[in-house]
Every structure is written in C-alpha cells, then in structure tokens.
C-alpha cells in the first residue's frame, strides 16, 4: 500500500482547509506552531514572530501530483518565506487507513527530492538551542510544535510516540548531505545526556514546495 505523510506549514489556514476539502483527506491533523527565524531577521523585514499552521495528513500517491499542483497554483507557499510543503513515505499504516485508500493507490514509489525531515524532541524551552546548533551546521530554519493534552491527558502523540507537555518538537527540513552533520551536532549539544534531554530522528522526503525554489 503506497501511502505518504503530507506536511504543509503555512500561516494560511483557509487554504489548508480548502486543500482538505478538495481532496477529501480523511486522516489529517491541523496544529499551530512557531517559525524559528531569528528576531533580527524578522525586525529587518518588519514582521512579528511567525505563527504557523501545520497540517499533517495521510495521502495516497494517487493524489500526490494533484495536491502538489493545488499548492503551487492556489496558495502562496511557493513564494519565498510563505511556508513549505513536503511528503514522506509511510513504511506501515493501520489496516483501516489502507482500506480507505485501497482503490485509489498507485503502485510505484517516487523519490523526487534530495531532502530529509529531522524531528527533534527536547525539554520545553530548549528549542532555540537546537535551532542555533542546527543553523551552525547547515540548516536554514525550522518549525516549533507545542503539544497539549487531549481528553484530559497531559501528553500527546507524535509519530506514535508519547510526548509530554513540557517538551518541544522541532521540525527541520535539510539537504541530504547536511543531515548527518546536523543530527550529530544536535545530539552532541542537546542529546539525552545534556540538560535538553533531546532525541532526534529523520525521515526521507519526496515532494517539496517552498524549499530552495
């Protein structure tokens, strides 16, 4: 079953909702996060601290080209600094999700982009340290996610991992040849044996929009 995880990071929530409705995406999560551009850059551009909407949705490869076309033609994401969008392959998924897409899924996987998504989870308040380390080793920026409990619980699920509310989740898209250097630096400076108590892992990315365009 050829399913992928779509990430769209943008401050345009209306366009994200249009995307969900147009392609009838049944399995999606819309969250809020903060961009990590430095305050000096934001001041120079006359901008306030960047607030972002993060859409995560499971899609089939059958829909990927249409979704990419929609984002490129009907959103501002391709414009510099307006957001990013990318997909990453899913190695496994629940049977009910596979059944929902069964009749629409293509057979061939495509890997069109030499990028990776680095996901870092650290104690709350340490995200800036992670981004400073990452930028010194080739990263251009990232997105900070703030989790909150659902249904009375004080933790939330991210990639099937339980993340406590006092944790920050940082998403960084980087070039393949920078991935190992960035991850090693993050783990050295902000890993499990440091005050940040961090972990990080990476996922390959397929389609990308808003990255080096």
Which residues make up each language-model segment?
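Positively charged, small/polar-rich N-terminal and surface patches that mediate targeting and assembly
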Residues: 1-213
């Amino acid at each position: 079953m050829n399913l992928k995880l779509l990430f769209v990071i943008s401050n345009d929530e209306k366009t994200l909702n249009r995307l969900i409705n147009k392609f009838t995406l049944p399995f999606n999560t819309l969250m809020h996060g903060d961009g990590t551009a430095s305050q000096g850059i934001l001041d120079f551009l006359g901008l306030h601290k960047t607030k972002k909407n993060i859409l995560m949705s499971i899609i089939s490869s059958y829909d990927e080209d249409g979704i990419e076309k929609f984002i490129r033609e009907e959103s501002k994401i391709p414009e510099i600094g307006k957001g990013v969008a990318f997909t990453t392959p899913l190695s496994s998924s629940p049977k009910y999700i596979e059944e929902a897409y069964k009749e629409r899924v293509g057979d061939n996987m495509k890997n069109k982009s030499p990028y990776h998504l680095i996901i870092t989870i650290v104690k709350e308040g340490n995200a800036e340290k992670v981004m400073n380390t990452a930028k010194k080793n080739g990263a251009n920026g990232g997105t900070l996610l703030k989790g909150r409990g659902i249904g009375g619980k004080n933790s939330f699920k991210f990639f099937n991992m339980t993340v406590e509310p006092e944790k920050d989740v940082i998403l960084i898209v980087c070039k393949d040849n920078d991935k190992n250097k960035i991850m090693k630096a993050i783990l050295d400076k902000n890993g499990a044996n440091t005050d940040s108590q961090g972990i990080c892992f990476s996922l390959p990315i397929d389609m990308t929009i808003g990255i080096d365009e």
